[in-house]
Design a protein with these regions (language model features):
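Active-site metal-binding loops of divalent metal-dependent hydrolases
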Residues: 33-35, 77, 158-160, 193-195, ...
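Alpha-helical elements of Rossmann-like donor-binding domains used by nucleotide-donor carbohydrate transfer enzymes
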Residues: 58-62, 143, 174-178, 202, ...
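Structured beta-strand-rich core segments of catalytic domains in phosphoester-bond hydrolases
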Residues: 71, 75-160, 251-254
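Loop/turn elements at helix/coil->beta-strand transitions in domains of secreted/extracellular proteins
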Residues: 24-29, 67-71, 98-102, 150-154, ...
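N-terminal, active-site-proximal structural segment of metallo-dependent hydrolase catalytic domains
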Residues: 18-94, 176, 269-271
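Bacterial Sec-dependent N-terminal signal peptides
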Residues: 1-23
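Surface-exposed cleft-lining segments at the edges of enzyme active sites
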Residues: 44-49, 127-133, 159-170
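Metal-dependent phosphoester-hydrolase catalytic domains
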Residues: 129, 167, 181-189, 195-271
Length: 271
């Protein structure tokens, strides 16, 4: 009898173990932020100087350390946190405030537009820069192909057109459809952006209709991310995915570091 009970218990444990293997999930933390060129969005170039560098280095480093994101997508990034002067050298932003991220994929800078992806512990296979086919300003999307737990994941950092009264919404719709078409055959996609949807979060619905999930305009409703400070009014920053479930979504508001709030979420890769 005891032998029978032992064998039944062993079989049950083996069954639980097999089920656990069949239902293996991978969870990562992803953050998306318009960092405003270290100029609070008021310029297409950094406004920080050597005299304040130590303070901002400590502040940004503490901010990113507490954030603890596996993947951090930044738009309106500035490769330099401080520009060179006649007597002092320029200061590289990755080295100064983001050196805790081993992998840095930084796209070209066009005035206000510069997209970047920082990551740790996830294999980076390649990175491509793709210009949008239709745009008012010079706009592109940065695509980093990663391998996460054996699966290929496309991670995108982008910044769509603004110009609300100058073909902004129609051009954004074209850009959104271009992204949907580009990744239609990919199982796992993570898109981080300042989508510039202004007061029209319904612009995100094209992604929903294409089978995507999202952190903003998702299960928590419309989260206001711009401008940072006491009275954000627009739902424009978002993490949009295919093949991932969203949880623990947070908006982090720090008007001293950017004119945009940061949005972060835990993403669980679905089988």
């Amino acid at each position: 009898m005891k032998k029978t009970i032992f064998l039944l218990t062993l079989c049950a444990l083996m069954s639980l173990s097999l089920n656990a293997q069949d239902k293996h999930f991978t969870k990562i933390t992803v953050a998306s932020w318009n960092i405003g060129h270290f100029a609070l969005g008021k310029s297409g170039d950094t406004k920080l100087t050597h005299s304040v560098l130590d303070f901002y280095k400590q502040t940004y480093r503490a901010y990113f350390n507490e954030l603890n994101a596996d993947i951090l997508a930044l738009v309106e990034y500035n490769p330099l946190i401080v520009n060179a002067t006649e007597t002092q050298a320029a200061v590289d932003a990755h080295e100064a405030i983001l050196s805790n991220y081993r992998d840095a994929q930084i796209g070209p800078k066009y005035d206000y537009n510069c997209n970047a992806i920082f990551s740790n512990g996830i294999e980076v296979l390649r990175t491509d820069t793709v210009m949008f086919s239709k745009m008012v300003q010079t706009r592109y999307y940065l695509v980093t192909t990663m391998r996460l737990d054996g699966d290929i994941v496309k991670v995108v950092s982008t910044h769509l057109d603004w110009n609300q009264g100058e073909n902004g919404a129609p051009y954004r719709a074209i850009q959104i459809q271009e992204l949907i078409d580009t990744f239609k055959n990919d199982k796992y996609v993570i898109m981080c952006a300042d989508w510039n949807t202004s007061n029209s979060p319904s612009e995100f619905d094209a992604f929903i209709e294409a089978g995507y999930d999202m952190s903003n305009h998702g299960y928590l409703g419309n989260l206001l991310t711009y401008p940072a400070g006491s009275s954000p009014r627009s739902c424009i920053d978002n993490i949009i995915t295919k093949g991932f479930a969203h949880s623990n979504v947070k908006v982090i508001n720090n008007a001293m570091l950017s004119d945009h709030c940061l949005i972060k979420a835990d993403l669980t890769k679905l089988p």
